């Protein structure tokens, strides 16, 4: 998947140009784009009165205009907050991207792992324009634990976008598939895989509920919201760190709370 991100960035931007991402963000994006010489501009997600993470549409529009950005990465479901964006939210985001003439990468690698009660809406499905300006990325790696096989795929309806991405991809051969990953993908997407994912989603919901309640009960000062998708919990430890006279740059071990990576890169 990151290979396609790099190829698309090479196809539609030049070194030194800016790309818009939401913050917090998947560190794989930032690493790849920085290595490609692109400037990263972040639009912070904000929490509403119920602690639900939301996009700041005004901030997105302002930063796209200020930095003359025409290439953006949209993560749906969102990594690492676990938000499963609603159709209206995606429509508003795509309207802003359209107004600023952006090519959009929609990372939908977590699309199979929505928790019960939530439904993934493909970005390309919300409008005709979204279908034509979006490069959608998918993979079985998160859902079926196949990341080590390095197999993903993209859906690009717009022929011009597709031709340019495929040309950029062909230069490095980084995106060439291998036989093992192809057959693993085929096997995962068979009916047996559907049944397994349905069972997995129930287990993840139970685990998320347990972890959420346990952390709130045992770690005063740690803030979190229940995820709607993915298998991650995004924690705000700022108050906890103040109470324990530490900071996010210091590895900590406190009863069962152990932090080997600070999360600052997100």
Regions found by a protein language model. Give the residues of each.
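A short helix->loop->beta-strand "cap" motif at the edges of active sites that frequently abuts
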Residues: 38, 99-102, 131-132
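Conserved core of the PLP fold type I
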Residues: 1-95, 112-113, 120-125
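Short acidic capping loops at alpha-helix termini that bridge into adjacent secondary structure
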Residues: 16-18, 131-134
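Conserved Walker B
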Residues: 108-110
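PLP-dependent aminotransferase class I/II
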Residues: 133-217, 222-229
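Hydrophobic "anchor" residues on beta-strands that sit immediately upstream
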Residues: 71, 103-104, 135
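Single conserved hydrophobic/aromatic residue that forms the stacking wall/gate
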Residues: 256-259, 263-266
């Amino acid at each position: 998947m990151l290979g396609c991100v790099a190829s698309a960035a090479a196809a539609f931007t030049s070194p030194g140009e800016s790309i818009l991402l939401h913050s917090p963000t998947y560190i794989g994006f930032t690493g790849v784009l920085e290595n490609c010489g692109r400037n990263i501009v972040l639009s912070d997600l904000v929490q509403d009165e119920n602690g639900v993470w939301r996009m700041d549409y005004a901030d997105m529009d302002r930063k796209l205009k200020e930095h003359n950005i025409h290439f953006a990465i949209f993560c749906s479901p969102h990594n690492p907050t676990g938000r499963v964006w609603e159709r209206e939210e995606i429509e508003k985001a795509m309207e802003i991207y359209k107004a600023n003439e952006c090519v959009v990468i929609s990372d939908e690698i977590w699309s199979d792992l929505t928790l019960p009660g939530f439904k993934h809406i493909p970005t390309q499905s919300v409008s005709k324009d979204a279908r034509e300006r979006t490069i959608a990325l998918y993979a079985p790696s998160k859902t079926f634990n196949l990341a080590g096989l390095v197999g993903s795929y993209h859906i690009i309806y717009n022929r011009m976008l597709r031709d340019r991405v495929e040309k950029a991809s062909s230069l490095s051969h980084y995106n060439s598939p291998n036989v093992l990953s192809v057959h693993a993908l085929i096997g995962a997407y068979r009916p047996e895989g559907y049944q397994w994912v349905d069972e997995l989603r129930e287990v993840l919901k139970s685990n998320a509920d347990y972890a959420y309640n346990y952390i709130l009960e045992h770690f005063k000062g740690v803030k979190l919201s229940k995820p709607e998708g993915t298998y991650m919990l995004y924690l705000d430890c700022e108050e906890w760190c103040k109470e324990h006279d530490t900071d996010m740059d210091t590895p900590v071990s406190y009863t069962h709370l152990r932090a080997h990576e600070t999360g600052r890169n997100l």
